[in-house]
A protein has these predicted regions:
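Bacterial Sec-dependent N-terminal signal peptides
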Residues: 1-33
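Composition-driven recognition of low-complexity segments enriched
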Residues: 20-304
Length: 304
C-alpha cells in the first residue's frame, strides 16, 4: 500500500473509533500528576459531585467509600465515571433519598423548573390546578362548556409539568419533552405575558440567545395569529407546534449542552466542546452521558 494512503487510512480509522466511543472525553493535553492530588481535593470533588447530581453532600460513610475507591484507582477517569453513574442509576434504597437514581432525577426536575419557571414548587402548581378545577366545576354548573374545556387544557398542562419528575426517570420522555412542558403552562405564561415576551423568553431560556428579526416575526405570527410559518425548519401554526419545533431543533440541543456546562462548570462551552457533544446528544438525547463527560474532567474535579 502507498505509505501516504496508509497514513491517511489509519488516521481516518482512528478518528472514526474515537468519535463514536461513548467514553470519549476532552481533557488537557498535559495531564497532572495525580499522585500529588491531596485528599482534601479528592474530598472536595466527591462533595461537588454529590451536590450537583443528587442535591446533597455525601454522608461521612459515603465520603470515606468514594475517596477510597478513587485513591485505589489513582483517580482514573473510569473510577470517576463509576461514581457518577452510580448516583444516576442505582436503585438501592437510601434512607432520605429513596435511591440515588430517584434523588438524581428529582434534582434534574428541580433544575429544569429553576431554569424556566423560577423554581415553582409542586405545591404552588397544585394550588393553581385546584383553583382552575374549582372554576371548571362552576363552568359545568353554568353549562359553559367552552370555558370548561379551556380550563381542562390548563389543568392538563400543569399536570404534565408535575409528571415530568417520574416520566423522565422512567424513560417515557426525553429532556426535550421536559422543557416543552416547562414553557407551555400558566406559570410560564404569567412570567412572560403576551406573545412578544413569550417569543423572546423562549429563545433566551432554551437557546441562550434572542431571535433574529425574521425568527421573531415568524414565531410571533404563529403564536399571536395561529398563522402557519416555518420555524426551525418545521411548519408550525400554533403555540404547541412552535414549542415542539423549537425543542426538536439543533439550536435547542446546543442550548442543553450550554445549560449543562453552566450547571457544572459555571461557564459556557467553547465551540470545540459543543461540537464534541452535539452530534452524540442530537442522536441519543443522552443527557446523562454529557453530564458524566463534563464531571469526570480534571477541570470539574479541580485536579488540573
Amino acid at each position: 500500500m502507498n505509505p501516504y494512503r496508509s497514513t491517511i487510512f489509519w488516521f481516518l480509522a482512528s478518528f472514526f473509533f474515537v468519535s463514536c466511543a461513548k467514553e470519549t472525553i476532552i481533557t488537557n493535553n498535559d495531564a497532572p500528576n495525580y499522585n500529588e492530588v491531596s485528599t482534601l481535593l479528592i474530598e472536595n470533588y466527591v462533595n461537588r459531585v454529590y451536590i450537583d447530581f443528587i442535591g446533597r453532600e455525601p454522608l461521612d460513610s459515603e465520603m470515606v467509600l468514594e475517596v477510597g475507591k478513587l485513591k485505589a484507582a489513582d483517580l482514573a477517569f473510569d473510577a470517576r465515571r463509576k461514581m457518577i453513574e452510580n448516583l444516576q442509576t442505582d436503585t438501592s434504597f437510601i434512607e432520605g433519598d429513596s435511591s440515588y437514581r430517584r434523588a438524581y432525577y428529582h434534582r434534574m426536575y428541580n433544575l429544569s423548573k429553576a431554569r424556566v419557571i423560577e423554581g415553582a414548587s409542586n405545591s404552588e402548581i397544585n394550588q393553581k390546578m385546584g383553583i382552575i378545577k374549582a372554576q371548571m366545576k362552576q363552568d359545568s354548573i353554568n353549562g359553559n362548556w367552552a370555558a370548561y374545556d379551556e380550563n381542562k387544557r390548563k389543568v392538563e398542562k400543569y399536570q404534565k409539568v408535575l409528571d415530568c419528575d417520574h416520566e423522565f426517570e422512567q424513560g417515557l420522555i426525553y429532556i426535550d419533552s421536559v422543557f416543552a412542558r416547562m414553557i407551555n403552562n400558566g406559570i410560564y405564561d404569567f412570567i412572560n405575558m403576551n406573545s412578544f415576551n413569550f417569543v423572546n423568553a423562549s429563545f433566551d431560556n432554551l437557546l441562550y440567545r434572542f431571535p433574529t428579526g425574521d425568527e421573531f416575526n415568524r414565531a410571533y405570527n404563529v403564536i399571536e395569529y395561529n398563522q402557519t410559518e416555518l420555524i426551525f425548519g418545521q411548519g408550525a401554526s400554533n403555540k404547541d407546534e412552535y414549542i415542539q419545533a423549537m425543542v426538536a431543533s439543533s439550536n435547542f440541543h446546543e442550548g442543553i449542552i450550554m445549560w449543562l456546562y453552566q450547571n457544572l462548570l459555571q461557564r459556557f462551552p467553547n465551540s470545540a466542546e459543543t461540537a464534541h457533544h452535539l452530534d452524540y446528544f442530537s442522536q441519543t438525547r443522552d443527557l446523562q452521558e454529557v453530564q458524566v463527560q463534563i464531571a469526570i474532567s480534571d477541570e470539574y474535579a479541580g485536579f488540573d
